[in-house]
């Protein structure tokens, strides 16, 4: 199978870190293969970095399994370039997972090596593998091991189970196996839906060359089959653990929930149809969702758009005649969902959202019995006064009200968010214009505004940059931008927004205009007063700025103004002075359960004490147990991680550290695996584990400084009770 005789090589580097400017490769792996899964050759070598051994922390050795001492006698990159030149040429296709990272090190340390193109298995996986825990290669491979088609490839490529991830040659093998699996998926989809071959033939996608597909004339108009939308049954709690008569409670009043278990409280409140449950963060929302699902309530609403595709827009899109690489990826994703019976597209790239924005149907509001929201999500609903106005609001975590509301009021504004939205609209209206449905003049006006906004971002960035020229600070407080001579050019452009408003209102829909203009008005409001400016880094040399109002300090009365003409009760699980929402239960199971949880929580601030506690952990009693070490300070987490490695605890436990051993998705996936684990992370990561139903055998509070430490501890007991094994 295949078109021209391309040479396929999988490439992987192990490096001293993730910093593209300062880190170096310490191992290279190359494997040449063909599209039939045959291994044609390969190369692997350790590489000696310039960094001294003392600079290479033990964490590098832990993650890569390489001995730092081994690197001392390894060759430098320039010493092996002649050995690897044979793999590269004008017909070479380089395959890899997140290949741009490896490509950077290839071009920097092995300059001049030629290639035809690169193919990223990370991006291809986002197109063809749906809803994984993470798109980390290790997680994807674990997920695919149960599939017969992948098992066959694994045997062909001689992937040894005893080899490990973070070995360059082994990871190159895995990239090749993942690529071949994904190519086979595309082949299967083309066989099942021949129209995909027609689309590829009309495209710019390099997949067209791999599959040797030639452009063919369509015999008739194409009408894509609809996705199979699965709607959960409409269920509602008829009776809960406690009878709550809302007529007996005062609107806008705060109530304590005492020692009632979270699940019992949810079951009691869920009896009231048309309710919004609002929580201080998404992890708590996910915990509530899981408990409600356990209670049989699955038709839950969320504060986000219901995904629907317009049948007519989809048909026009399918018949437009030529497709970009991004559009082909979207069509592949669509047919992959169709084949698997998935009704909601797993949108996970900017290009996905651009195309979806152009194809989505006008939203029809669904009548959900219960809607789950974060505090911030609820605040955005309340600003749209007509939305869900008949719903009863239960505002959980009212003790976090002060922080969540003030953060919402002073929420930062990222101009790139607005620019991305304008680019989505440009794609939509460019598509509509190509159908002849609107005058090209309207598209031209939209592009003109987008270009003006792009210039505005550049001028504002240049004038902001001056304040950060002679300081290492990444956050500054500035006087109002409006009328500020230091922002002369910015102010000249700010005046022009008013001229664009009526024009923009005419060329896009009312909903789209509201979305854009609300962002513009939020920006202008920020610029009217003293503001915080934060410098965010793309990498070591590129940066951008986000802007926010100075932190607001709102009173309870100001907070309640947002809820005017709404029905709302505010619930606290910490304030014992408040009247109780529910009378104390006759038994005290919850107290016993809480005490059980508290018996497994240790407050230890010294590394030696933590190591001693871990050594005393009974692995026989908890063979799949997890010790969670709560640490909110990144450097202290790193130091503790190194101490665990030096103590050899990585031999007895799986070590997971937030933002060191992987992103949250990868670490959450590993936390569910068999065997004993030590997990180091912050409060938010702990709540994510609770939301994923990961049992915590022991909780060590290592460092938890700050004004909210009592609230955090209370949250752990409240939301983690079910998970403290």
Give the role of each language-model region.
Residues 279-371, 431, 437-447, 459-465, ...:
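A substrate-engagement module of RecA-like helicase motors
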Residues 660-725:
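Conserved RecA-like P-loop NTPase helicase motor core
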Residues 2-116, 130, 134, 138-150:
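Conserved non-catalytic scaffold segment of RNase H-like nuclease domains
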Residues 290, 355-369, 374-492, 575-584, ...:
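Signature of the SF2 helicase/ATPase Hel1-core->accessory helical subdomain module
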Residues 600-632:
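Conserved interdomain hinge at the start of the Helicase C-terminal
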Residues 242, 353-364, 379-385, 487-597:
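A contiguous, basic/glycine-rich beta-loop/short-helix subdomain that forms a polymer-engagement track
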Residues 2-3, 176-241:
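Acidic two-metal-ion nuclease catalytic site recognized across multiple nuclease folds
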Residues 93-100, 104-109, 139-208:
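Acidic, Mg2+-coordinating catalytic module of metal-dependent nucleases/exonucleases
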């Amino acid at each position: 199978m295949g078109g021209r005789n391309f040479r396929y090589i999988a490439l992987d580097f192990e490096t001293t870190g993730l910093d593209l400017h300062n880190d170096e490769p310490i191992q290279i792996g190359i494997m040449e293969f063909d599209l039939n899964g045959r291994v044609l050759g390969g190369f692997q070598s350790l590489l000696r970095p310039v960094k001294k051994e003392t600079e290479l922390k033990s964490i590098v050795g832990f993650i890569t399994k390489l001995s730092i001492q081994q690197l001392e006698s390894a060759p430098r990159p320039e010493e092996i370039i002649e050995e690897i030149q044979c793999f590269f040429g004008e017909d070479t296709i380089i395959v890899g997972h997140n290949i741009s990272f490896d490509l950077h090190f290839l071009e920097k340390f092995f300059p001049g090596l030629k290639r035809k193109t690169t193919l990223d298995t990370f991006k291809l996986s986002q197109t063809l593998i749906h809803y994984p825990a993470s798109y980390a290669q290790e997680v994807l491979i674990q997920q695919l091991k149960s599939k017969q088609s992948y098992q066959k490839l694994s045997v062909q490529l001689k992937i040894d189970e005893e080899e490990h991830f973070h070995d360059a040659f082994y990871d190159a093998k895995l990239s090749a196996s993942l690529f071949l699996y994904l190519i086979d998926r595309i082949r299967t989809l083309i066989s099942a839906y021949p129209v995909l071959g027609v689309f590829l033939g009309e495209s710019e996608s390099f997949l067209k060359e791999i599959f040797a597909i030639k452009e063919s004339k369509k015999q008739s108009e194409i009408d894509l089959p609809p996705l199979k939308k699965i709607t959960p049954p409409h269920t509602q709690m008829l009776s809960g653990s406690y009878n709550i008569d809302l007529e007996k409670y005062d609107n806008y009043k705060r109530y304590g929930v005492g020692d009632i278990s979270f699940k019992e409280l949810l079951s009691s409140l869920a009896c009231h149809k048309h309710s919004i449950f609002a929580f201080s963060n998404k992890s708590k929302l996910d915990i509530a969702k899981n408990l409600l699902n356990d209670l049989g309530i699955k038709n839950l609403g969320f504060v986000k758009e219901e995904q629907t595709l317009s049948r007519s827009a989809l048909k026009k899109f399918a018949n437009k005649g030529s497709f970009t690489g991004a559009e082909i990826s979207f069509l592949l994703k669509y047919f992959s969902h169709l084949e698997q019976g998935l009704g909601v597209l797993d949108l996970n790239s900017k290009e996905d959202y651009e195309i979806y924005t152009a194809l989505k149907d006008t939203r029809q509001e669904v009548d959900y019995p219960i809607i789950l929201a974060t505090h911030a999500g609820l605040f955005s609903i309340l600003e749209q006064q007509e939305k869900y106005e008949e719903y009863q609001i239960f505002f959980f975590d009212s003790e976090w009200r002060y922080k969540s509301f003030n953060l919402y009021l002073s929420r930062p504004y990222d101009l790139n968010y607005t620019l991305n939205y304008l680019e989505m609209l440009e794609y939509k209206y460019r598509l509509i214009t190509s159908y002849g449905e609107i005058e090209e003049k309207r598209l031209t006006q939209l592009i003109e505004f987008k270009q003006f906004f792009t210039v505005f971002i550049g001028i504002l960035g240049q004038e902001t940059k001056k304040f950060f020229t002679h300081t290492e600070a990444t956050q500054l407080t500035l006087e109002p931008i409006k009328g500020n001579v230091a922002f002369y050019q910015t102010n000249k452009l700010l005046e022009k927004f008013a001229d664009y408003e009526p024009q923009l209102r005419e060329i896009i829909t009312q909903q789209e205009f509201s979305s854009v203009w609300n962002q513009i008005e939020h920006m202008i409001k920020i610029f009217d007063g003293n503001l915080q400016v934060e410098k965010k880094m793309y990498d070591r040399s590129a940066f951008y700025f986000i802007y926010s109002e100075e932190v607001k300090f709102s009173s309870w009365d100001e907070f309640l103004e947002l809820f005017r003409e709404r029905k709302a009760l505010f619930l606290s699980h910490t304030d014992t002075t408040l009247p109780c929402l529910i009378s104390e239960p006759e038994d005290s199971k919850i107290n016993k359960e809480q005490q059980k949880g508290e018996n497994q929580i240790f407050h230890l601030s010294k590394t030696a004490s933590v190591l001693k506690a871990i050594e005393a952990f009974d692995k026989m009693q908890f063979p799949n147990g997890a010790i969670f070490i709560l640490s909110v300070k990144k450097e202290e987490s790193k130091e503790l991680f190194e101490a665990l490695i030096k103590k050899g605890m990585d031999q007895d436990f799986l070590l997971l550290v937030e933002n060191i051993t992987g992103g949250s998705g990868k670490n959450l996936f590993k936390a569910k695996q068999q065997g004993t684990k030590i997990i180091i992370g912050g409060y938010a990561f702990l709540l994510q584990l609770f939301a994923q139903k990961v049992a915590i055998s022991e909780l060590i509070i290592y460092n938890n400084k700050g004004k909210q430490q009592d609230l955090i501890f209370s949250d752990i007991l409240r939301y983690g009770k079910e998970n403290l094994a």
